[in-house]
Amino acid sequence: MPRRPKKPLPKVSRNYREIIADELLAFWASLVSNWIFILPSILVIVALVHLVRPMPPATVRIATGQPNSTSEVIGQQFREAFAKHHVKLELIPSSGAQDNIKLIESGQVDAAFSQGGVDLGEHGGVLRSLGSIAYQPLWLFYRGPEVKQQDLNHFLKDRTVSLNIPGSGSRVLAEQILQAHEINIDTPRFVTMNASDSLKALHKGEIDAMFVVAGMESRNVLDLLESPGIHVFDFNMADAYARRFKYLDAIVLPRGALDLSPVSPSTNINLLATTVDILATDQLHPAIQLLFLDAARNFDEKRTTFFSMDGKFPTYMDTRIPESEVARRFFKEGTPFLWGYAPYWIASLFDEIW
């Protein structure tokens, strides 16, 4: 029986291209013939979007802190992250975390870096938390011979100590700890000066010790940690403080965390830590909130971790302040599915609609 000649296979890829081309031409023809109906519809949709949610501002202000502080350093990194989305982030210097609360409540800034435990004032209800992004230990730096396992009352006796300045988070936390020890700070031994001046005075021997609340990003902290003859007080009762003050955690700076040759620190150091928090008003545009949250996540991914409990940020910790709805979705689901593929404000809009 003679074989039947084989039929050539259809050129599938060519057929698909022709079908797609035909569909696109038909779609274009439909647009051209019905533009008088389609264009007004598009304009109405755009107008509704603007009415329901205005465009995000081109400039945002955030209160940071003192020069060389953790908040200033983080703010500079956030400013670069915002610039990638063509948003200008203005860094507004301040006395510190407590002062930042006043700035945001008075409307002078749109957002602020703060810390757990600061007084929220009478208008705390308008604040929303965008989460905690890092630990900020309470450091007690001192000069002279290294002291081990000493009670704070005994350690501070006859020492001249800087408590930082009113309005700073360092001052707030230092006063709370000293009050718990029933230490009277209204004496000449306790002086008032900002972190930079305290650092200089400690180096010169004009004071014996200084309190400062700051993360490892702070240039002041790095300067002091690298200075010969300057030591860190070991808060050996850190667990007791953490039980008394709910906004504090007991953390450890592990032996060798700073350097392995020579080993620095030479032993584990117990510290108390609050957190760096991002606060905003309940009126801050949701798309701008997403920029802050994304910048916080990128900051955490790129930074070096030093402390024993450093791997849980960013997260919501200070429950005194309501968590923003945008932050709640972000911590649960991450960035919107259009993030990185569309302008940030469109990704934010679809995130809420979806």
Where are these regions (language model features)?
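N-terminal hydrophobic or amphipathic helices and topogenic motifs
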Residues: 1-98, 105, 123-126, 131-135, ...
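Signal peptide-directed extracytoplasmic domains
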Residues: 111-153, 174
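Pocket-lining segment of extracytoplasmic ligand-binding domains
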Residues: 183-273, 284
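Sec/Tat-exported extracytoplasmic proteins
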Residues: 82, 86, 108, 113-116, ...
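Beta->alpha turn/N-cap motifs
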Residues: 93-97, 107-119, 195, 211-218, ...
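Solvent-exposed, acidic/flexible segments
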Residues: 67-75, 93-97, 130-134, 163-174, ...
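An extracytoplasmic/periplasmic, membrane-proximal ligand-sensing/linker region
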Residues: 193, 197, 204, 214-223, ...
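Bilobed "Venus flytrap"/periplasmic-binding protein-like clamshell domains
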Residues: 57-85, 139-204
